[in-house]
Amino acid sequence: FPPKGVLSHVSVVEMPCYHKLLVISDVAVIPLPDFKQKMVIINYLSKTARMLGIKTPKIACIAPSEQVLPNVISSTEGALLAKMGDRGQLGDVIVDGPLSLDVALYKEVAEHKKVRGSAVAGDPDCLLFPNLESANVFFKSATHFCNGEIAAMVMGTKVPCVLTSRGDTSRTKL
């Protein structure tokens, strides 16, 4: 673990509208990660967070709703990943899911929606998105609407691999 051959795009995002750095994935490599790939991505997210000095990363599995919805794959997989995290199967991490983006990022929203007992809601270090589309929209929104600064890389390679967006600023590309 992780299995060989799984590459994933991991970004570190700094936004004035959030109280700390966020590590997010996958913005550009895996269009629709399957469950095993999500396990690997969690490993990459936690590894990146640890490189930033976070001992026990808090990871939010993003879905359309914070309720477990049996017909929504990101919802059921988020719940399963959270249970695996509780049992230590994903390493020294705290995983919660499913969490809608607003619940994940804002404690007040979590309280308003009566999401109780979450160590992640309102304070995640990492966001695991269900697919490339949602992650990419967040990535671009963070840079353009929140004036965020981003550093991005491909994890799972044998040598360091930085991957920038064509629309990134010169500063971000450096």
Predicted regions and their residues:
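Anion-binding alpha/beta catalytic cores of soluble intermediary-metabolism enzymes, centered on
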Residues: 1-120, 125-129, 134-174
